[in-house]
A protein has these predicted regions:
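N-terminal alpha-helical interaction modules that lie
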Residues: 1-90, 117-173, 228, 232-237
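Residue signature of alpha-solenoid helical repeat architecture, marking inter-repeat boundaries
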Residues: 89-90, 134, 175-178, 210, ...
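TPR repeat positional signature
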Residues: 95-96, 100, 135-143, 183, ...
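Residue-level recognition of tetratricopeptide repeat
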Residues: 100-101, 148, 188, 221
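Residue at a conserved register position within TPR or TPR-like alpha-solenoid repeats
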Residues: 102-103, 183, 190, 223
Length: 237
């Protein structure tokens, strides 16, 4: 190599190094400081998320999948979600919605509901692979599915069912069978506690919402027990 060519290459290398030194280091805290930067950062996060979803799909054990979501992936992505919320920007954010799904998958209902309410206000939608595209329906279904399974297993599903009821049978517009399932379960819980009037109230509301909910036998038993309790009370007086 000639001395002239070697000198030219050295000058070019020094120029590249100088240019690189002027580029600021990547700072996650500044990645959401503008809409353009936010979209670039979202693309990076989605690439990482796709890889992590493939990792989950490759695991056969449900317990191991839950551990991965709870112990590794949620801490990894929650920081980004918190920064997105703090930035005040509004755009479709599949990463936020996936974090929401994982919170409910891992039965972190308090954090999940808090994020769900934000997502609803933000206009976020569920991923295309979900038949239920609105967040409200996803949350209501997830909680009642879990609660019914817990009750069947002899464990207490409260206070989650009661806490969500004002939204499920009130603020949120849902297919009527969903709030009817909440009232059906709450009616059964009230019967277990011999709170007959409250049980009848829930069971009647379940039928009002969705006549095919199937609580006729329970409703008759609660009414019979209530009449018996009232008769006993009157005789004591």
């Amino acid at each position: 190599m000639s001395l002239a060519l070697a000198h030219k290459r050295r000058i070019l290398a020094e120029g590249v190094a100088a240019d690189a030194a002027t580029v600021p280091a990547y700072n996650p805290s500044e990645a959401l400081n503008s809409p353009a930067n936010a979209q670039k950062h979202l693309a990076l996060m989605l690439t990482a998320l796709d890889g992590d979803l493939e990792r989950i799909s490759a695991i056969n054990s449900r317990e191991e999948r839950q551990r991965l979501k709870r112990d590794e992936l949620l801490p990894k992505y929650l920081d980004y979600v918190q920064r997105y919320r703090a930035a005040g920007l509004v755009y479709p954010n599949p990463v936020l919605v996936q974090v929401l799904v994982w919170l409910f998958d891992t039965v972190q209902f308090e954090a999940g509901l808090e994020l769900a309410l934000f997502a609803i206000g933000d206009g976020q939608e569920m991923p295309e692979r979900f038949k239920r595209r609105d967040v409200q329906t996803f949350v209501a279904d997830e909680v009642i599915d879990w609660a019914e399974a817990e009750y069947k297993a002899g464990r207490a599903p409260e206070p989650y069912v009661s806490n969500l009821l004002p939204l499920v049978d009130g603020q949120w517009q849902l297919f009527e069978r969903i709030p009817a399932r909440y009232h059906k379960l709450l009616g059964q819980l009230a019967m277990d506690n011999e709170e007959w009037a409250q049980a009848i109230e829930h069971l009647d509301r379940a039928v009002e919402l969705y006549p095919e909910i199937g609580v006729g036998t329970r409703r008759a038993a609660a009414a019979k027990a209530l009449a018996k309790a009232e008769a006993a009370k009157q005789s004591d007086e």
